[in-house]
Amino acid sequence: MARIAGINIPDHKHAVIALTSIYGVGKTRSKAILAAAGIAEDVKISELSEGQIDTLRDEVAKFVVEGDLRREISMSIKRLMDLGCYRGLRHRRGLPVRGQRTKTNARTRKGPRKPIKK
């Protein structure tokens, strides 16, 4: 297994799909990385040489991925919460942030229903 950005990339998958196992790399970014590295999308990871894997590592290193991306996102949310702005309050209360209705629906964000105690 090739190791890129601290993640074991599955060998049996095509390069485009295999790179999406890295947090922060979707299909579009995966295609861009492969184009910059000069590698075909339909090649399996097991068929790549060490040199090609090294170029993939270098291309992935140009982006914010994995732990750094997770940290950046959590710091952004924490900043909103510390500011006390509307979006920060919604994050703090565990409610939808982007204006969705909450009288009905929003169950994913609010969690399971709590029974009314009599």
UniProtKB/Swiss-Prot annotation:
Range of residues in the leader sequence: none
InterPro entries xref list: Rbsml_uS13_C, Ribosomal_uS13, Ribosomal_uS13-like_H2TH, Ribosomal_uS13_bac-type, Ribosomal_uS13_CS
GO CC, alphabetical: cytoplasm; cytosol; cytosolic small ribosomal subunit; small ribosomal subunit
Alphabetized GO MF terms: rRNA binding; structural constituent of ribosome; tRNA binding
Domain of life, source organism: Bacteria
Any matching Pfam family: Ribosomal_S13
Keyword RNA-binding recorded: yes
Family in the record: Belongs to the universal ribosomal protein uS13 family.
Job description of the protein: Located at the top of the head of the 30S subunit, it contacts several helices of the 16S rRNA.
HAMAP family, per database record: Ribosomal_uS13
Subunit structure: Part of the 30S ribosomal subunit. Forms a loose heterodimer with protein S19. Cross-links to the P site tRNA and weakly to the A site tRNA. Forms two bridges to the 50S subunit in the 70S ribosome, contacting the 16S rRNA and proteins S19 and L5.
Entry-linked NCBIfam families: uS13_bact
Descriptive protein name: Small ribosomal subunit protein uS13
Organism name: Escherichia coli (strain K12)
Gene: rpsM
